[in-house]
Amino acid sequence: MSGIRAKLRNSFPFTIVIYEFVISKKSMWPSRKKFAALLDSSTSICLDLGGAGAGTRGWTSVDMTQECDIFWDLRLPLPLPNNSVAKIYSSHLFEHLTYKQGQELIRECLRVLKSGGTFSICVPDARIYIDSYVGIREIPAEFFGWKPAFNQTTAIDAVNYVAFMDGEHKYMFDLENLLHILSASGLVDVSARAFDPSLDRAERDYESLYAIGTKR
């Protein structure tokens, strides 16, 4: 969602929600055919939710942007059958969802994953910005790269930056609650993981948490 759309949502929330629903529904009809084509192919299905790794070989990117392979509102159920996906990856998506929306999406991921399939996630590390606020660490200007979201009044704006992102962010994570959320969802062998240069975006490594879990 663009910054302008976020501002309009704050002023006219009901109108913007209805507009997004109608537009997304219309745009997603062709996407159902693309999902069906994935199922008909002989290759393993690997989904990149949020499209951060768009173009990564072997992964199908899915999000509400035309740059992705498949245009889809991830707040809605995935049009895929149970136990049909080998791997799911998501980078810097879940902070844009409310806690409830994030829980629903994780449940969808578990539903479509095959037994033994992996769910790998990357999100911003809120603790970095909170540590800056309480004086535990100093962080460089690159941690506030999106200028519309950084007001730079006092130390609290380090927290405001990552928590709200000018209306873009809905929920924040540290490693403890990220691992708890994944484990509580039913994933097993949940653990933190290292940066993966074949998948994760290097320019976001400095502010990111990584975790992975497996469907039983």
Where are these regions (language model features)?
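S-adenosyl-L-methionine-dependent methyltransferase catalytic module, highlighting the catalytic core
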Residues: Q101-E104, E108, K114, T118-R216
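Conserved SAM-binding loop
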Residues: S44-D131, A211-R216
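Structural motif
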Residues: L38, P79-L80, L182
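Membrane-proximal basic amphipathic "stem/tether" segments
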Residues: M1-S42
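A structural signal for well-ordered alpha-helical scaffolds and beta->alpha junctions
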Residues: M28-R32, C46, D174-L175, Y206
